[in-house]
C-alpha cells in the first residue's frame, strides 16, 4: 500500500509551497526555477551573518566547518564527555561522546525540554553565552537565556511476557550528555524533521534521491 502526503505544514508561503510541490512532483518549469534561483547569492558568507545554519550533504563537511568556526572564537574551550553506562552501541549514541564548546558558539538543541518549561525544542538554535567546566548557559534568538542541564537517553530492549502477553521494557544501558551540538553546519539528513529560520544550502555534492528537496523544505 502506498500513502502520499499532499499537505505541507512546515511552510506557509504559498508561492514557496508551490515550488516545493513542483520539485517533489518533478514538474518544475522555467518560471518557478527562476523564482527559486533568486535565492542563489554568490559569495554569501555565513560568517558575516548571525544565526544562519549551513546544510551540507556529508558529515565530514559539516564537521570541518563547525571545527573551523569554533577554532576562530577567542574564548577558551571546554570539553564535556558523555557518561555511558551498561550496553549502549557507539553507533547509536544520540549526542556527541565529546562535546567541545566555547562562549559564542552556535549550537542546536537535539531534544525537547524535559523540564516542562518549554524553553527549547529539538532543532532550536542558540548561542553559548557562558560556559565553564560545570555550567552551560545558552541564549536563544528570542532573547531567553538559561542553564542547560544534561539529558539522559536509554537503550531499551523489549520482550514479551509469555504469562501476561504484555510487552515489557528492559533498560540495557544509558547515555548522559548535554542535549547540544555545534550548529554552524549540519547534514541535510540530520535536518529532517527540523525547521530553520535562516539556512544556507550546500548541495553541490548531493548523492541521494530527494536530498535537495529535503534541504529546501527546511
Predicted regions mapped to residue ranges:
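C-terminal accessory regions
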Residues: 108-218
Amino acid at each position: 500500500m502506498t500513502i502520499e502526503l499532499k499537505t505541507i505544514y512546515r511552510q506557509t508561503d504559498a508561492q514557496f509551497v508551490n515550488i516545493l510541490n513542483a520539485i517533489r512532483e518533478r514538474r518544475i518549469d522555467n518560471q518557478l526555477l527562476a523564482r527559486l534561483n533568486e535565492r542563489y547569492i554568490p559569495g554569501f558568507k555565513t560568517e558575516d551573518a548571525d544565526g544562519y545554519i549551513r546544510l551540507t550533504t556529508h558529515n565530514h563537511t559539516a564537521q570541518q566547518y563547525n571545527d573551523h568556526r569554533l577554532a576562530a572564537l577567542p574564548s577558551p574551550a571546554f570539553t564535556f564527555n558523555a557518561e555511558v553506562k551498561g550496553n549502549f552501541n557507539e553507533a547509536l549514541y544520540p549526542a556527541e561522546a565529546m562535546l567541545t564548546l566555547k562562549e559564542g558558539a552556535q549550537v542546536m538543541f537535539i531534544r525537547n525540554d524535559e523540564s516542562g518549561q518549554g524553553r527549547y525544542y529539538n532543532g532550536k538554535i542558540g548561542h553559548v553565552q557562558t560556559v565553564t567546566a560545570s555550567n552551560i548557559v545558552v541564549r536563544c534568538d528570542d532573547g531567553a537565556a538559561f542553564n542547560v542541564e544534561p539529558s539522559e537517553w536509554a537503550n531499551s530492549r523489549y520482550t514479551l511476557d509469555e504469562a501476561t502477553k504484555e510487552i515489557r521494557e528492559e533498560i540495557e544501558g544509558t547515555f548522559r550528555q548535554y542535549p547540544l551540538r555545534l550548529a554552524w553546519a549540519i547534514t541535510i539528513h540530520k535536518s529532517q524533521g527540523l525547521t530553520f529560520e535562516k539556512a544556507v544550502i550546500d548541495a553541490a555534492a548531493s548523492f541521494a534521491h530527494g536530498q535537495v528537496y529535503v534541504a529546501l523544505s527546511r
